[in-house]
């Protein structure tokens, strides 16, 4: 994709998908390793693929109607549909159902979802929200309870936020490895 000149108009969006996916994957990997001591690769895979639906929609819009992206409703449609489309793609690829379900429910924290969801889903949703809070400061205004929501996520050996705090070196190392 990096060499395809026909993607010029959406290149910044594609680069953002790649960067976000890598950063969320690094958080998922390091926290899963700390929380569960097992399956960090599965958590990393969920993080890497959580935006596959966004990638599909962006490519489809670019190839079929590039003006679609100027429609004011496009951003909301993209946010609403990307987890559903992502799950469908991952199921078609035969990925484990836990990963597919986590991708579908990646926004459960902000959507007021249940704390009874699978640990991988809670982890992915928390990692995505934490990343968004770092790169979208306005999100704190839209969701003043976002920090509280993150603090309420418990995984294995502790709270998500405590696990992130003790995993900072692993997160940074994994982000660097994925970005290379």
Each PLM stretch: what is its role?
Residues 34, 89-101, 113-180:
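Divalent metal-dependent phosphate-bond-processing catalytic cores, especially two-metal-ion Mg2+/Mn2+ enzymes
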Residues 1-84, 91, 113-122, 131:
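Acidic/His-rich, divalent-metal-binding segments that scaffold phosphate/diphosphate chemistry
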Residues 1-2, 108-111, 170:
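A short structural micro-motif
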Residues 42-46, 100-105:
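Beta-strand segments within the central parallel beta-sheet cores of soluble alpha/beta enzyme folds
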Residues 9-14, 65-77, 101-105, 137-155:
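Short alpha-helical "patches" and their helix-cap loops
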